[in-house]
């Protein structure tokens, strides 16, 4: 595995690249306030001889550059994804988008359909239920919180049903936490993800479905966001997507929105799909 910063016109993007230099490029696109550790479990399931795996911190997250007000939104992130593929010399590539990353993946597919070989949409496609805003906004507010220590934060979250299995989430949080006055807080600050959320509220993601002309795997979390905050993909939207996107297949996983990307079952299904 190689860690590096790739310099794009928009700024520096922190990346980790693993697998074979001659393998098919697969790019993992994280969620709203997430970082490159989001794809540890999924990438472990992918054959390192067949795939070149790129995980990255989106602009304004983790160790990537903050690009300032008015520079976020799905098209900006999609442009970065395409630029990353360009820098790695990949004429075609696969995409795995989790949560916000799924909508960004669809924008990439809309922008350069001839370059996108396969797409995995991980628990996002249409409009989430309104109740989802409660835990999502709480997570954004937490980004400004200072905790007494790294151990104190880990003790608060390690037993929450959002963050299971714990080991990959511990790595994600360990990557994200930094020392500040009086304790620890997060590398990722609220402005970038908040601007992306405000952008989402203005969009109709259903209009992006027509851009999916390549094989697509839609992975739906069958469990509500704990304790009862609903679904990012409703049952109705899941069925509608499979009707309206002829190139798509779907799978439902016994997980919630936060655990699905760390699920062994989801990872295996994704690996089988991308090996085709």
Residue ranges and their predicted role:
Residues 1-26, 48-51, 90, 239-240, ...:
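Alpha/beta-hydrolase fold catalytic core
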Residues 14-66:
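Conserved HGGG/HGGXW glycine-rich cap/lid loop of the alpha/beta-hydrolase fold
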Residues 43, 54-96:
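Active-site loop/oxyanion-hole signature of alpha/beta-hydrolase fold enzymes
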Residues 97, 101, 105:
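Gly/Ala-rich beta-loop-alpha elbow adjacent to hydrolase catalytic centers
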Residues 106-110, 117-148:
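Flexible "cap/lid" loop of the alpha/beta hydrolase fold
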Residues 148-200:
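Conserved alpha/beta-hydrolase catalytic His-Asp/Glu region
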Residues 180-244:
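Conserved serine/cysteine hydrolase catalytic core
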Residues 251, 255-264:
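Catalytic histidine-centered segment of alpha/beta-hydrolase-like enzymes
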């Amino acid at each position: 595995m190689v860690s590096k910063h790739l310099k794009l016109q928009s700024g520096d993007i922190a990346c980790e690249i693993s697998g074979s230099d001659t393998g098919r490029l697969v790019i993992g696109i994280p969620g709203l306030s997430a970082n490159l550790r989001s794809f540890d479990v999924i990438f472990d399931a992918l054959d390192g001889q067949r795939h070149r795996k790129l995980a990255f911190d989106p602009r304004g997250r983790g160790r990537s550059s903050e690009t300032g007000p008015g520079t976020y939104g799905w098209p900006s992130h999609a442009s970065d994804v395409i630029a990353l593929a360009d820098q790695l010399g990949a004429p075609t590539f696969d995409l795995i988008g989790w949560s916000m990353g799924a909508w960004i993946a669809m924008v990439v597919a809309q922008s350069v359909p001839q370059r996108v070989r396969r797409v995995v949409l991980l628990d996002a496609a249409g409009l989430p239920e309104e109740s989802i805003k409660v835990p999502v906004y709480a997570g954004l507010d937490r980004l400004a919180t200072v905790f007494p220590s790294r151990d104190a934060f880990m003790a608060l979250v390690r037993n929450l049903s959002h963050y299971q299995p714990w080991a990959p989430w511990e790595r994600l949080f360990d990557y994200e936490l930094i020392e500040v006055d009086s304790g620890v807080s997060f590398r990722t600050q609220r402005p970038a993800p908040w601007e992306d959320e405000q952008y989402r509220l203005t969009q109709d993601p259903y209009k992006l479905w027509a851009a999916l002309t390549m094989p697509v795997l839609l992975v739906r979390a069958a469990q509500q966001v704990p304790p009862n905050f609903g679904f990012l993909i409703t049952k109705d939207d899941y069925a509608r997507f499979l009707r309206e996107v002829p190139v798509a297949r779907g799978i439902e996983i016994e997980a919630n929105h936060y655990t699905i990307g760390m699920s062994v079952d989801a990872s295996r299904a994704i690996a089988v799909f991308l090996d085709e």
